[in-house]
Amino acid sequence: MKKILLIILLLSLLPIARVALPQNDPWRHAQNQSCFAMNGSKVFHIPGELETTVQKRIEWMKELGVGWDRSDWWWHVMEPEKGRFDFSVPDKIVDYFEKQHIQIYPILSYGASWWKGRNAPLSDGDFEDFGKYVFETVKRYKNHFTYWSVWNEPNIVPFWTPEPNPDHYARLLKIAYTQAKKADPECKICAPVIAPLGAWDKNFTERLFQLGCMDYFDVFDYHYYRNNPPEDEVPAEIADIKALMLRYGKEKPIWISESGVSAPTKDKEKSYKDQAALVVRNQLLCLACGVKRFFYFDLQNWTDNPDDPWDSKLGLVEAGGEKKPSFLAYKTMVKEVDFKNVIGRFRRPDEGWDAVLLFDPKHSKYILAAWCNGLGSTKKVDFVCEPLDVKIVHPYGDVEIRTLNASPAPDQFTRSVSVEIDQNPRYIHSVDPFRYLPEAAVRLSPEKIYMNPGEKVGFRLETSPLVNLFEHAEAEIIGKTPPEGLVWDEKNGSLEASKDISPGTKTVSANVRVASLLKFDRRILEFKTSAIVEILPVMTIQLRPYMEENALKLQATVINQSPWYLKGALSLVEIRTAAPKILMKKDVGIVQPQATWREDLLLDKKIVTEYKTPFSWQLKFQDKESNPFRIYTAPFRDNAPVIDANLEEWKDVPALVINRKEQITRGPEGWTPSDVSGEVYFWFTPDAVNVAARVTDDDPMYNTQPPNFIWKGDALEVYLGFDGPAKRGVLNKKVDFQVGIAPDCEKKRPIVFLFHEDRIIEDAKVAAQKTPDGYVIEASIPLKEFGSPVLSSGSLLGLDAAINDLDKNDWAPAGNDPGYALMWNGTTRNWIDPSNWGMAVLGKEE
């Protein structure tokens, strides 16, 4: 008897194996059909609060109609010691969630419990250990989860530390995919789960594809956050992702596992209304562009404190539990859209409104979700509907019925229903399929293509959604306008680029006629559809100087985007005078078609420290060259200037010149230097960075923005990398800084603002004054604000500067910021990516 009791006791101490559940559970089947999902419970952060906080969040999710919850599935919890797995915490979570009929989307992450000071793998053993964790975890939960996310935002700190590296993530992804498929051949791997860097991180992703990662994921998962109207940016971004996948393989399903709209609590009345509109428009457009599942981030605010960062205010519910208008708008969207076919987009940009067409197979009717572009506008639109009573569902769920007062005549196929729309989508039921279906369903495919000169790709008019849903119609091309250098063979479904076509963006358009085949309804509809073709240069040359362990190095890259073999030598050229000087040469051998050659070369610091005036470098290969890399020579002095907006003391300081069209990073056509241009000067001392600028501006010192948005008005932006120029693609906030210097702002005074800490530098000195053709501005910023870096003559810094300009009467289309921005060396990614910055050399004056 004692032996039996002992055996029972020992068995009770063993980990409980996950019970295999039938894959045809009705609730699980329903969730697999749903496109709506949430970053909702945060259960792995608070596993001890299942019955309280987590349960409340699950109840909110159910009220919204959402049955998917994205959750961390932390390695260090499941393997607290190397080789010892403990699944007790996740087992409990799985049991609790499945009883609630909530499907978890788990994130395989982050570092091992025995790693110190980092959360990303570095050694061979680290990668192998991660693979073991993936295998054991997927094997245990294979009857519960089909989809697995490999990491979260590996392209930024703090999720990949000490520094993001696409080559390392590619290796990790391949190991994770292999081990997961070994544990469960039916599982689906989702990657690369990248964070947005302004727009989607194409550079990081393309590097993964170049390393063969297209074969190591089943779903393309990425993140985006935008607080501006999405009608232009979002569809273009999704088309670009599809085009890049096609370039390196085949198109795969797209998920967005994080996307949110912030609603600052300082101005609730406006921000809450805008959030309600943008949350819904974002998701509707993504679904119309082919996104299969969309996880909103976040269900609940982290905090309601007005002074906390933007990402703490993304919730549909306040931190205190009060539901925002966006909660009701999201709930209405789920009810109107889920389990219906999202056909596509019906655009009317010239009329100021947009829409997405849905088909309800259960009731065999069409629904149009329609709204005004931009924010704050209203418009009355006459919608063409079937001759029935028409239901209109308003943004927060209110239902209106427009009755048909009399029976329709035998030859009456439609009725017109006038609806006032605004920034919030409204759902008009029973719209006429012939009026809206052709434009929403018929499109050129692919909608975006990357091509080489001389290449032929598949290209056709996609009509199957129209034919499948509306069999009594046919579509034909009645006119097409491929640009010069492109030949569209409509019969064979191909598009071919000539060998001498110039690189750049081309638009291919087609005029389409759709005719109804019904004997009693012979309507004809004509419209235009288009696709974007990006002709790649034969090759791309990239130059990236950087500091590593106090050595100056250069990363040289040749990307062969052509179908031909390339051979030759790479030259580093110094551009200082009319006669460029070759500093070094490197034989790259043969670069195969669609391949990349990359090498890191050691440079002698003397080639940058012996000069007193600014200059630039370029890499040249065959007849192609890289963008210039600009190098500024800044004085390092013991004395500091007087900050009084008088630049007489600066007359012998070299100028960083910003006055060329190619330096524009934001703004409309028609720029001239008189609109905005200028010179920026830097003067370093042992305890301060001193900055001055002489700006040409036809409406000077106009800036009414709050401090964290001074870049939207007249202002300088300064970028400083105190560990030297960098090749990393993401800021290291300990050494990389973005500073705004504005002559005026919402506070009615000039300020210096540290963006990454979201604060005014009150210890900085700043002065500005107008001039006959613009303004001058001058500032001194203590080095202690940057962690007190030690500078000296010969120090090399990452450096860049931008001049931002806004005039009182400037205007831009919805979704765009008015005014201009000009950048000395970098790009629009400067705020997050220091690899685009130039370099400063500090020189002690004699």
Each model region followed by its residue ranges:
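Substrate-binding cleft and catalytic face of glycoside hydrolase catalytic domains
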Residues: 61-216, 224-227
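Structural preference for beta-rich elements and adjacent junctions enriched in aromatics
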Residues: 543-553, 557-559, 595-846
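Noncatalytic carbohydrate-binding groove/subsite architecture in carbohydrate-active enzymes
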Residues: 166-283, 289-291
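N-terminal carbohydrate-binding accessory modules
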Residues: 21-67, 80-81, 95, 99-101, ...
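Carbohydrate-binding surface patches
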Residues: 348-388
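C-terminal beta-strand-rich structural cap/linker in extracellular carbohydrate-active enzymes
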Residues: 402-441
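Intrinsically disordered, low-complexity Pro/Gly/Ser/Thr-rich segments with frequent PxxP/GP/PP motifs
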Residues: 484-503, 577-608
